[in-house]
């Protein structure tokens, strides 16, 4: 946030982040949490998925990996696919533990917001401070995810959501993403 020049009250943000922490900590941490679970870390070999880059894994809530995979900034999965994959996930999870769907979705939405903020922080640091272009290019996609998330209310975090809405409305984040797509024009060709 500070890099954008936005003004905000740090103590109010801290209060909302404490509330978020309390909500997230309601979830069990008794499962393996990949932490960087995204499509580029899943390889298909002989028709079977193989997982790479899991050295940062540890015990944690399974919601985080679901949020990481299904709300990847550049993946732009449609809601219909997310819903289908969430249903598949819950069916598989039911083999190991009972699932209260209402609670599942209630907790998941908080993890999706948390993961989106974590991604924006990482992209901002690696892009704007370490000057890595790939991360700068990824920021608008994560902002678009955040914009979509904020269409649904998070009454637990009123100040945070107001700041995030202001952030998503900044000029540098309101450009049409289609303008950012690469277009290659071949003007001559020889062989």
State each model region's role.
Residues 31, 50-52:
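Protein kinase-like catalytic core scaffold
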Residues 13-17, 113, 135-139:
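Hydrophobic packing residues in well-ordered alpha-helices of helical domains and bundles
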Residues 1-34, 43-45:
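ATP-dependent phospho-/nucleotidyl transfer catalytic cores
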Residues 36, 53:
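Conserved catalytic-loop position in the HRD/HxD motif
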Residues 45, 49, 57-59:
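Activation segment
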Residues 121-191:
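ATP/Mg2+ or Mg2+-diphosphate-binding catalytic cores
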Residues 1-3, 62-98, 110-130, 142-149:
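Active-site activation/catalytic loop segments of kinase-like enzymes and analogous catalytic loops
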Residues 29, 34, 58-59, 105-113:
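Secondary-structure capping and boundary motifs in well-ordered enzyme cores
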């Amino acid at each position: 946030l500070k890099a954008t020049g936005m003004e905000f009250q740090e103590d109010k943000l801290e209060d909302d982040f404490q509330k978020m922490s309390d909500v997230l900590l309601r979830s069990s941490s008794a499962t393996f949490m990949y932490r960087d679970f995204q499509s580029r870390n899943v390889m298909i070999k002989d028709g079977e998925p193989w997982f790479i880059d899991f050295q940062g894994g540890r015990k944690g809530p399974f919601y985080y990996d679901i949020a990481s995979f299904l709300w990847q900034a550049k993946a732009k999965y449609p809601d219909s696919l997310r819903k289908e994959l969430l249903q598949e996930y819950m069916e598989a999870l039911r083999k190991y533990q009972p699932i209260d769907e209402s609670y599942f979705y209630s907790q998941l939405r908080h993890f999706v917001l948390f993961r989106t903020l974590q991604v924006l922080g990482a992209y901002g640091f690696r892009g704007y401070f370490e000057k890595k272009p790939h991360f700068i290019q990824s920021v608008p996609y994560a902002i678009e995810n955040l914009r979509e998330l904020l269409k649904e209310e998070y009454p637990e975090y009123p100040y945070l959501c107001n700041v995030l809405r202001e952030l998503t409305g900044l000029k540098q984040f309101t450009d049409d993403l289609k303008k950012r797509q690469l277009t290659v024009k071949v003007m001559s060709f020889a062989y």
